[in-house]
From Swiss-Prot:
EC number: 7.1.1.-
Protein name (record): NADH-quinone oxidoreductase subunit N
Any Gene Ontology biological process: ATP synthesis coupled electron transport
Localisation: Cell inner membrane
Amino acid sequence: MDLSTAFPTLVTDLPAAFSMSVVGGVGLAMIVLDAFRNDHPAIPWLGVAALGVSAVWEITHLGAPPSTVFFETLRTGGFVAFINLIILLTGLATILLSVPYLNQLRYDYGEVYALIMFCTVGMIMLGSANNMVSIFLGLETMSVCLYVLTGFIREDEGAVESALKYFLLGAFSTGFFLYGIALMYGATGTMALPAMAAAELGTLSTRLLFWGGFALFLVGFFFKVSAAPFHMWTPDVYQGAPTPLTGYMSTATKAAAFAALILVLVHAVPGGEWQLSVAAVAVLTMVIGNVMALAQTNVKRLLAYSSIAHAGYLLVGLSAGTSAGYAGALFYLLVYAVMNIGAFGVMSMLEWDGKEGREQTLSSLAGIANDRPVLGSTMGVFMLSLIGFPPLGGFIGKYLVFAPAVDAGLTWLVVIGVLMSALSAYYYLRVVYVFWMQSADEVAATDPVRAAAFPRATVAATGTLVVCAVALVVLGVFFGGVLETTLGFFETTAMATAP
């Protein structure tokens, strides 16, 4: 690298990192502001403004052509802008939902919002990586922030225990991930994704080295997206973490990790040798997620197993290995982010002080829709969309990941996916039934912990849930424009070799 041209190149490429620069810079400003007053009311709104401005920037770049920046370590273009948009909007919704929640717990510290911003920066880097080093840096930046966010409520033993489990298992999975990268580098002699695909794997030993490394690499990714059999951490961590941040963890993390995985599959291993392996993991993930969710009485654990199942549905789209499958997965990531952040947002508003209030069993929430009809109505929309009920976005999302798999000859995989999706109707509709049709008096004898009044939600937080519910209807009816956009990425962006 010529040092005389390196600095001008970095300056030229800086606009491509607009979102990372703005979000990261505001995160630093939050820490400085927090040093003077740790509960400054302007801190979360600084985050909302930064994420909102960055989201608008990404919308204007959805039609941008593919390119690479920062010495070909990061990608730009419509594909990256779409993923960044999901991540930024999810982060924005998380802050709006966290404000009343953290105020109630008296944990509205500036560093919490700063960590959300830094975590978002890591996710953006992960979703735009064109190099294995960039993938690792983005993944670890995201992960370290999530470890802290999971357990920052120090008085809550469940949260601290969840954070410790997440950290230990996350560090363990990172070892597999790094070793996989090392083996792939040893086989190809490069860290750049397109160069890996172009490398000669002429001998049997070289091929074994590469595919062995790729298998270990996938283990690390499957851990991050809660795919079976690397999902065991998910229910405990989701249950113990602060509820709005659980929603962030379950949505934005998946968006960034699946985006990086798509880029690796498209650029580094464009052949179809991996399809059956990914399909097998998809089957295991769908079956375990849905079957285990049937027995759950804690709503957050139920949503955790639901999150595992939806990772399986996304893997069905990737298993097709086609442009339509990848485009369907992108659409599904958008829909999944909306309905899951909404579901966890509702649960955060139905949580009251004390251990009993944080348990959130189904029985403790019986008839809550009668007291909070807006929350009950939006939760109903989110549950129906998670089932895949038309005309909501979840139905279109599942169709768009299942149809390419059928076209790719994986009909057996789609049959399993449809059966598991039908099975999920039981536990999702059970939530709707408890919210709307079961009286609190019916369970008073067995669950006397029911609070007389739930925390008052802010207008911004309630508005966020309503917007999410309306967005699911819009995405289910007027999905053509979004689908056309995502298909275009794989004709001009992700499938193209960037210069």
